[in-house]
């Protein structure tokens, strides 16, 4: 307990976290891009390598997932302006949002309907490629659509893949691994939604359920893989491959911004708000964006008030050496994708010099925002995907120290805010109706 008292004294915001209040934190350790990138374990070459690999797999993806045919086997999501939602937020919060507001709809990514379709699918594809190359069954010059054959499925069936997940990562790893022919086991934490487990089982995935939280599910997945040399473990807490799969999103987003004639430069800053669980998804996307836009992009992570693991790890500098449970927070939230008590140390340390800040949002707020987005834009997201939505309001507050510190108070008016909508299109209709109803009840209170 002594250590916790010392933390509270050193970082007064810890008291607000313990009280599960909504907070906004500006990262004092952010550095200029050129300084930060020099010490980074990853760089542009790593992201380019991931991009090339996804291009090699595109013919296979287009063949086995017809919903990606139109995009030539590239798994990508729309970027849309949400002007009606912007007006609604300004009215409800009695505060202007300076600049344009857009939504990146990773909720509608093909195959698994969430941001995890980026990193999760990429890591499985990379593993499959390595196995096939090692065994002389494939060369990088081949048309990868040959993977859709009994020969390859029979080969991959000798191997297994394991992952621990609160839901969405399990969906992407499970669906992709099963499609290739791997034996796949998803270790699901207590907060994983039933429909996600049902969907995985319908695809032939072995789902193991736990009463404990996310960290336990990951630990069990790791143990399974350790005991079996033919089993590959997708390590959501430490994986560079997952991170790089997410980072590829940046160059795709750049093209979409250009198509919308949206400029990003020193006079037109870009602000991006990313829901954060263990950190891989938002960390990878933010890293990719920093590589492209350097000091002209400002990335913020958003977490539930009951699971602020990354904020706690970054603020105290303890990273994965501290969990929210250590300071008495229960890690119980309806934002199942973000219900993580201990952050990734790899992501925290990698992103510390690049990240602008972090904030928390209550479950009640997520439901209200869910209902509002459905009403104004007819876009339905799952609760955790709405965490980014109050980011622009936080940043545009008159007293926001970040804008002042970065001399953006005037520039923000010509800037762009992108809220990353991380999941939702695969939520069954009855479940989504329940979410909407809850949002309606909370709005009427």
Curated annotation (Swiss-Prot):
Keyword vocabulary terms for this entry: Lyase, Pyridoxal phosphate
Root EC class: lyase
Residue numbers of N6-(pyridoxal phosphate)lysine PTMs: 116
MF terms (GO), sorted A to Z: D-serine ammonia-lyase activity; hydro-lyase activity; pyridoxal phosphate binding
A GO BP entry: D-serine catabolic process
Superkingdom, taxonomy of origin: Bacteria
Catalytic activity annotation: D-serine = pyruvate + NH4(+)
Family annotation (InterPro entries): D_Ser_am_lyase, Ser/Thr_Dehydratase, Ser/Thr_deHydtase_PyrdxlP-BS, TrpB-like_PALP, TrpB-like_PALP_sf
EC number from the UniProt entry: 4.3.1.18
Cofactor dependency: pyridoxal 5'-phosphate
Matching NCBIfam families: D_Ser_am_lyase (TIGR02035), PRK02991.1 (NF002823)
Family: Belongs to the serine/threonine dehydratase family. DsdA subfamily.
Protein name: Probable D-serine dehydratase
Species of origin: Bacillus mycoides (strain KBAB4)
Lineage: Bacteria, Bacillati, Bacillota, Bacilli, Bacillales
The encoding gene: dsdA
């Amino acid at each position: 307990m002594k250590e916790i008292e010392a933390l509270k004294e050193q970082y007064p915001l810890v008291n607000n976290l313990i009280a599960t209040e909504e907070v906004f934190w500006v990262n004092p350790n952010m550095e200029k891009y050129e300084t930060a990138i020099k010490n980074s374990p990853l760089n542009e070459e790593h992201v380019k390598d991931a991009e090339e690999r996804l291009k090699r797999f595109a013919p296979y993806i287009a063949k086995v997932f017809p919903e990606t045919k139109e995009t030539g086997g590239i798994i990508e999501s729309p970027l849309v302006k949400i002007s009606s939602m912007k007006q609604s937020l300004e009215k409800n919060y009695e505060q202007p949002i300076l600049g344009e507001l857009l939504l990146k709809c990773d909720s509608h990514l093909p195959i698994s309907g969430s941001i995890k379709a980026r990193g999760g699918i990429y890591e499985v594809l990379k593993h499959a490629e390595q196995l096939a190359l090692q065994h002389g069954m494939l060369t990088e010059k081949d048309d990868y659509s040959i993977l859709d054959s009994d020969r390859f499925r029979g080969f991959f069936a000798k191997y297994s893949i394991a992952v621990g997940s609160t839901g969405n990562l399990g969906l992407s790893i499970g669906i992709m691994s099963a499609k290739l022919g791997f034996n796949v086991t998803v270790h699901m934490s207590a907060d994983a939604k039933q429909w996600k487990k049902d969907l995985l089982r319908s695809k032939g995935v072995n789902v193991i359920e736990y009463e404990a939280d996310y960290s336990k599910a990951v630990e069990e997945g790791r143990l399974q893989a350790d005991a079996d040399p033919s089993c590959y473990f997708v390590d959501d807490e430490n994986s560079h491959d997952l991170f790089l799969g997410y980072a590829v999103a940046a160059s795709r987003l750049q093209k979409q911004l250009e198509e919308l004639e949206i400029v990003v430069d020193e006079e037109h800053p870009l602000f991006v708000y990313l829901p954060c669980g263990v950190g891989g998804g938002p960390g990878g996307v933010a890293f990719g964006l920093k590589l492209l836009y350097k000091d002209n992009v400002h990335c913020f992570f958003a977490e539930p008030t009951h699971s602020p693991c990354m904020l706690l790890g970054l603020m105290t500098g303890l990273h994965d050496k501290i969990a929210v449970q250590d300071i008495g927070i229960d890690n119980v939230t309806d934002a199942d994708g973000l219900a993580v008590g201990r952050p990734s140390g790899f992501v925290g340390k990698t992103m510390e010099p690049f990240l602008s800040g972090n904030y928390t949002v209550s479950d009640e707020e997520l439901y209200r925002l869910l209902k509002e987005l459905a009403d104004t834009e007819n876009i339905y997201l799952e609760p955790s995907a709405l965490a980014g939505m109050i980011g622009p309001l936080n940043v545009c507050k008159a007293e926001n120290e970040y804008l002042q510190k970065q001399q953006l108070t005037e520039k923000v008016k010509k800037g762009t805010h992108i809220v990353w909508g991380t999941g939702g299109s695969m939520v069954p209709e009855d479940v989504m109706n329940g979410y909407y109803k809850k949002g309606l009840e909370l709005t009427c209170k």
